[in-house]
Amino acid sequence: VLLLRNVTVPALAFVSVSTITAAILVATGAFTLDEMAGFIKEGVKGVHGTAILFIFSVLFFGVMTDAGMFDKIIGALMKKVGNNVIGVTLMTCLIAIIGHLDGGGASTFLITIPAMLPVYKRLHMRRETLLLICVTSMGVMNLLPWGGPTMRAASVLGIESNDLWSQIVPMQVVGLVLAVGTAIFWGFQEKKRIAKLGDAAVEDAGKYDDSDSEEKNNELARPKNFIFNVILTLAVIIVLVMDIFPSYYVFMVGCALGILVNYRGKKLQNSIIKSHAASGLTMASTIMCAGVFLGVLSKSGIMEKMAIMMAGVIPVSMGKFLPVIIGILSVPLALLFDTDSYFYGLLPVLISVGNQFGVNPAHIAIAMVVCRNCATFISPVAPATYLGIGLAGVEIKDHIKYCFGWQWGVSLICLVAGLILGVITF
């Protein structure tokens, strides 16, 4: 509520609510101070990697932008698509789908948003649309057997993730079609909106090319290092996808090499780092405070109790329709439960309830995995969400308001498709 009503910044909202909750739990004797301190440490421990990743990824892409690498790349892209807004949205969808083959939300945001955001700016397209297309595509691709939600659900069922995924495939295919449809639909929406801005905006975007005019006016541009910067960026992305080292370490090394090669001298290097510090630290602090929030609510068992309460609300007469009910509610629930609490807390409870009515546990899991995934990257309790909105420069409340209805719709269509195709039965 604090986030959506814009009462305060996310970091303060997370730490305030979690501190008040912790104080109440300690005061009532539910937990000791030492136990609560442990919960907080565990919560921060779970997100500190993402926070560090955000700091150094922002710095890395900031350095590449300063050096003028993206100016040339975007110039080439603009020549290909021209003023074709729909072409841009389809390209966004394609990059997000391919980028999410590794199942990592953070890496997909890092690949897609820095590459496409300058194009959106040039064409006067909304950043929220960029994020919406990204999260729709990523939500569908996150169903892969090595994706976190599928693996968690499979572990609860006691089966291999490949076995669960093989049942999900028909719904995933429908989801991919919806992702492409999302790109086309919102491409038309953006095209109409830009038309209302007047021809000047479109003409301004169409005049863009990859000449050195901007670089000459930018004292930080390093056109001679373009090839090196492209190779460095590709190397960083490849190592990220290979998952050999922690993501944040890859960006640490990338930052070090990028700054050392492009900018000589301690004074200039310090200036470059400071110029990107504000955006990186602001979002990193939000992620760390979200970790405190998750630690208190998850480790104290509050989320698990919420899951049990949710299961208890379902009428006995509706028991056999449990997969459909949970499928319909999955998107709103994604905003309340983190991934672990959702699958390790709520799923086992619902399976036990479903057993009383002869409901196939796999069908409950499939409904929860597919429908919930649509909202994974708009959830305020998912650390990767903050990486995405931070890179795009969008407020969390605006991201949720812009995407929630659409993601819920995609989720419901996937659910109906599952029923029609026989993936989920009564």
Language-model features: locations:
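Membrane-interfacial loop-to-helix junctions in multi-pass transporters
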Residues: 45-51, 77-91, 122-130, 224-228, ...
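Transmembrane alpha-helix interface/packing and boundary motifs in multi-pass membrane proteins
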Residues: 2-8, 61, 95-104, 135-142, ...
